[in-house]
From Swiss-Prot:
Species the sequence originates in: Pelobacter propionicus (strain DSM 2379 / NBRC 103807 / OttBd1)
Disulfide bonds: none
Entry's Gene Ontology cellular component terms: plasma membrane; proton-transporting ATP synthase complex
Location, primary (coarse class): membrane
Keyword flag Magnesium: no
Residues engaged in binding ATP: 169-176
Protein name, as recorded: ATP synthase subunit alpha
Role description: Produces ATP from ADP in the presence of a proton gradient across the membrane. The alpha chain is a regulatory subunit.
Length: 502
């Protein structure tokens, strides 16, 4: 084949005509120091606060400090291979995480990458980690119940959809148990759950995931884990990633529940970050904006107005206290941000009252409006009765000759305390809770020995399930007890009492 010169020149001319000058311009900087997950970078003069940076080896970073001559950034990943003198690139994007239905049933790290070995997450939807919370106009007051399945919670410190209810207590008092039971209780409902584990042992997180899987709760749950072995920046950002995933469902008009386990460890991680970034320390060496750290997170949980879709995001933050000191810096901060708290006490826990809820110190500021009418009817005096019982029990220790009324009150109180105990991983439906509290309030348990109450309760539920199913379903549908229904419940309880005592 003969090569013709004019053909070659024509091809060259064509290529020159079609040549497009594509140059990728990116602003770069040089690492001047790195350690403990914090990098100081020189040369990124156009960087934005919260912007993602690209470190060598594909590791991401997030801009936290903007100073005159350098930028302080948190490395979101393994930083041991990053050295001084390495080049860092700006991405022009604010920190974001994947969101959507594809995350349900998965365990991800603080930046949304899967860590459960089930392959990549297929989603094209990303959302910014730091978003401003909805304004006043976009919100609506809490009016729907978020059933926890725990008698003590649903009766005395009810939680509503869109509420922020703090779970506070010393270590090993059952804080995570309350949260996990609440997730398990959402089975068969319309609530998507997000469990954010911050600074916990990996074995503990694996245990929680296994329990959720055993009860079929992973079908509607996302787990975000920033374990104790991960760097402070990842522990700091994990709750924001979790709430961003929850907001996706809230903004679609769905209902979501998020658990932060626990925010004390996030505050410690943020303190570490701030001190490494040379920010001035304040009380307990926390930085001045540690209140804003938690308030901007918890304000993102709310009930949206009907015009905005009517979705909700309910938050159950957990705070660990030291030796029951609720007046420390972080506990008081979070108590003042949330709409109430469930206070778990170690003395109650060790005396066998589980969940170990201290009724006197626990409160729900907005949940009462969301409580079902039937529960309000039976649990209205419960808190007062228990408080009076505790007072009487304290006095009864001094003397033995008590009048009949006091003895009856003590006996009733003892039985109320007993029926509010509940085994872990066994949440109850609203109508069954109403029945057992109704039985206690109306004297059906007064003559029974306290030791038989657990068996009484289990057999009573079985009796209503098998022989009074229509009454149970009516109570479930009506959500209130009228005179006719009350008569039927009393008759059924009388019948069961005869059979139980026989």
């Amino acid at each position: 084949m003969k090569i013709r010169a004019e053909e070659i020149s024509e091809i060259i001319k064509k290529q020159i005509r079609e040549y497009g000058k594509e140059v990728e311009v990116s602003e770069t900087g040089t690492i001047i120091s790195i350690g403990d997950g914090i990098a100081r970078i020189h040369g990124l003069s156009g960087a934005m606060a919260g912007e993602l940076l690209e470190f060598p080896g594909g590791v991401s970073g997030m801009v936290l400090n903007l100073e005159e001559d350098n930028v302080g950034a948190a490395v979101l990943g393994e930083f041991t291979a990053i050295k001084e003198g390495h080049t860092v690139k700006r991405t022009g994007r604010i920190a974001e995480v994947p969101v959507g239905e594809a995350l349900i049933g998965r365990v991800v790290n603080a930046i949304g990458e899967p860590i459960d070995g089930k392959g990549p997450i297929k989603t094209d939807t990303f959302s910014k980690v730091e978003i401003k919370a909805p304004g006043i106009v976009a919100r609506k007051s809490v009016d729907q119940p978020m059933a926890s399945g725990l008698k003590a919670v649903d009766a005395m410190v009810p939680i509503g959809r869109g509420q922020r209810e703090l779970i506070i207590g010393d270590r090993q008092t059952g804080k995570t148990a309350v949260a996990v039971d609440t997730i398990i209780n959402q089975k068969g409902g319309d609530v998507i759950c997000i469990y954010v584990a911050i600074g916990q042992k990996r074995s503990t997180v694996a245990q929680v995931v296994a329990k959720l899987s055993d009860h079929g709760a992973m079908d509607y749950t996302i787990v975000v884990a920033a374990s104790a072995s991960e760097s402070a920046p990842l522990q700091f950002i994990a709750p924001y990633s979790g709430v961003t995933m929850g907001e996706y469902f809230r903004d679609k008009g769905q209902h979501a529940l998020i658990i932060y386990d626990d925010l004390s460890k996030q505050a410690v991680a943020y303190r570490q970050l701030s001190l490494l970034l040379r920010r001035p320390p304040g009380r307990e060496a926390y930085p001045g904006d540690v209140f804003y750290l938690h308030s901007r997170l918890l304000e993102r949980a709310c009930k949206l107005s009907d015009e905005c879709g009517g979705g909700s995001l309910t938050a159950l933050p957990i705070i660990e206290t030291q030796a029951g000191d609720v007046s420390a810096y972080i506990p008081t901060n979070v108590i003042s941000i949330t709409d109430g708290q469930i206070y778990l006490e170690s003395d109650l826990f060790f005396s066998g009252v589980r969940p170990a809820i201290n009724v006197g110190l626990s409160v729900s500021r907005v949940g009462g409006k969301a409580q079902t009418k039937s529960m309000k009817q039976v649990a209205g005096t419960l808190r007062l009765n228990l408080a009076q019982y505790r007072e009487m029990a304290a006095f009864a220790q001094f003397g033995s000759d008590l009048d009949k009324a006091t003895q009856m009150q003590l006996a009733r109180g003892e039985r109320l305390v007993e029926i509010l105990k509940q085994p872990q991983y066994r949440p109850l439906s609203n109508e069954k809770q109403v029945l057992i509290i109704f039985a206690a309030n109306n004297g059906f348990l007064d003559e029974l020995p306290v030791s038989t109450l657990r068996r009484y309760e289990d057999e009573m539920y079985a009796f209503f399930d098998n022989r009074q199913a229509d009454l149970l379903s009516e109570l479930r549908d009506k959500k209130a007890i009228d005179d006719e229904l009350k008569k039927r419940i009393v008759a059924a309880l009388e019948q069961f009492k005869k059979e139980f005592s026989a």
